[in-house]
Amino acid sequence: TKKKALMQQQLGGFFRTELTKAFGPEPEPATLPIDRAYLKTANLSAVAFTECTVTDFHEGEHKGRRFSAANVELRRTVEEKSGPDNDNWMTRTETLFRGIVVRCKDICDPALDIALNDMFQERKKDDITDPAAFRKYFAAHTADGREVNDLVTPQLRDLVQKLEASSGSAKLCGLILRDGDLTLALNTRYVFAGIPEELDLRDIDGIRKWFTASLTGMGNLLDLITESPALTGAAE
């Protein structure tokens, strides 16, 4: 957007400095890309997407652990019959996911192989403590597609709840623990390394504060993930 270009022009230097201060220099090329090709193979959404937008991708280190993150939107086009006699086809675009995708390297037990996907059921935040309820809202699979609901430990359920409690608008879309790495797709209004649309461009101080806070927010999220006992693979 024009607004974004203008902001980059004015504050690009500040943004880069803050990012490097928070997460170190950006590797070239990226070792943990978040792009269309990766999102297609990762299957973070239970419903396949046809279009995606990735913005503010950054890779770096937090407390010695390599990670990458980006703001992502996944959409699909749906064809529906419409008109008085249902004889017209109408195409509409549906947003499947809007939030952040985070990849963490060498963060969990390499023996773990589990992918959790939100099943797109309506639910309230507090519905997922109970194993039976959790099963209704999330499907668990291995890399080769086997269903592994029994491998969902209390620790893993607890991690999902903590992720959803991390911000008022957070809702898990997908979480993958595989080959020692973790990938997270979290629906949220939180914007990583960026600022929300509605911020006034003339408020330079406000933009700076917001940007820095978004980096701190990512650090907190990474701490929450790293500290989870779910990553060691040991059930109680």
Predicted regions and their residues:
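Alpha-helical transmembrane spans
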Residues: T1-A5
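GGW-centered surface loops in extracellular recognition modules
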Residues: Q9
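Nuclease catalytic cores
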Residues: G12
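Charged, low-complexity intrinsically disordered regions
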Residues: T17, K21-F23, P29-R75, E80-P84, ...
